[in-house]
Amino acid sequence: MDKTIPIEFANSVDLAIIAFYFVSVIGIGLYFSKYIKGAGDYFRAGNKMHWWVAAISSWMSGFGAFVFTGLAGMIYLEGLQAALLTTTGLPAMIFAYFFFAKYWRRSRVMSILEYFGIRFNKVSLQISTWFYIPIYVLIMSAGLYSLSFFVGTALHFPVETVILVAGISIAIYTVIGGIWGVVITDTVQFLVLLPVSILMIPLSIHAVGGMDALVAQAPSGFWRPFSGEIPNAMVTIPFFLAYMLQIIHGQNTNPIAQRFFSVRNEREAQ
């Protein structure tokens, strides 16, 4: 039976809520700008950040519209083996707890690039800086595009328009509010996203006819990861291991490491 759910585009109330959200995040950046008295406040919050705020921000920094679009699509096509990609943050956090967190906090630098300059030399600092710039332009562009594609589809707006509005809003609260503007905005997003995501679980299961229907209608190999039953699967064991290494690296270097620099002591970094 075809259970396709028709798409209902946003109405005026939805648009008003979204507009309020954009105004709010810009307001957060403006509000926390008053706490910035120097570079230490701007880049590492003057080492006054509470661990739980830093933790939420770290998690949210790796969470975007891709989870609801690209990753959800991969799980739909490839089953549990694609869903296991979401577990790769666990080894990253284990490495952070036992090694990276306390040593990054102990370094007392404002960025990893600054650490390169202190630990090695200015040449290392310059090379690393110019190496990071194009990489993070691509990473941020991909994240902004996935966000804009998702929002543009829901609002029935051109993707280019959403990219422009979202990009400018993000730039404003980031540049004005510094690390405080970023982490508080991340925390607000978390408080909005968590209940909605939890609510989506029973609604999604109900939409497919219950758990029994979900299990019964899944294609062969959907619940058996890496069994070879999924044709042309992208998520293979080598892919999974490479992805896990990338997450371990990404969660313990720029820009996530800024949270380690910003908390009050090594214990809170852990």
How should these model regions be labeled?
Residues D2-A10, N47-M49, V53, G70-L84, ...:
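Loop-to-helix junctions at membrane interfaces in multi-pass transport proteins
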Residues D2-F68, T174-G177, F190, V196-L203:
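Membrane-interface "cap" regions at the ends of multi-pass membrane proteins
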Residues K3-P6, M74-Y76, F100-R105, S146-T153, ...:
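Membrane-water interface regions at transmembrane-helix termini and the short interhelical loops
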Residues T4-L15, G40, R44-N47, G79, ...:
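Membrane-water interface of alpha-helical transmembrane segments
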Residues F9-S33, A45, V53, G73-V109, ...:
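Extracellular loop-to-transmembrane helix junctions
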Residues F20, T88, V165-A166, I184-V188:
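Hydrophobic core positions of alpha-helical segments in small-molecule transporters
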Residues I28-M49, K102-E114, V123-S124, I256-Q270:
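Membrane-helix boundary/linker segments in multi-pass transporters
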Residues M60, A83-G177, L241-H249:
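Helix-loop-helix module between adjacent transmembrane segments
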